[in-house]
Design a protein with these regions (language model features):
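Non-heme di-metal
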Residues: 1-128
Length: 128
């Protein structure tokens, strides 16, 4: 389900207008707080997670605010019509739905009921 959600997002960005694609990245407005929580939570709770593994999220603590500021400015300057503004809101809703689907898939695979799909990461398994 996570792969499907990511592919749906890539297709969305490919097929929509530039302003819609940029608008879908506005979830980055909230990323630093979320990444900070993820970093500490994952390091505390998962022995297979190391500081090195978390480098992507650590970089996002400073990169995400710049990316979000750029995206917000771009959307404000380019979504001038009511139709374009509605499309921007739809793009952001789509992206949040993609993120929820990913979270639901991870919950289903690794928590309850714990059905890890074939080919996925298995904690403590041959790949983990």
């Amino acid at each position: 389900a996570t792969r499907f959600a990511v592919e749906a997002y890539v297709n969305f960005v490919r097929e929509k207008t530039l302003v819609e694609a940029v608008a879908s990245s506005l979830t980055e407005l909230f990323a630093p707080k979320i990444h900070k929580e993820r970093i500490s939570g994952m390091l505390e709770n998962y022995d297979f997670i190391s500081d090195d593994v978390m480098q992507y999220f650590k970089r996002r603590l400073t990169q995400a605010p710049d990316d979000a500021a750029f995206a917000l400015d771009y959307v404000k300057r380019n979504a001038r019509t009511p139709e374009a503004q509605a499309a921007v809101l739809d793009a952001l809703r789509f992206k949040t739905n993609v993120l929820w689907v990913q979270l639901d898939a991870l919950y289903h695979a690794y928590y309850d009921p714990g059905l890890i799909p074939p080919g996925a990461f298995v904690p403590g398994g041959a790949d983990g």
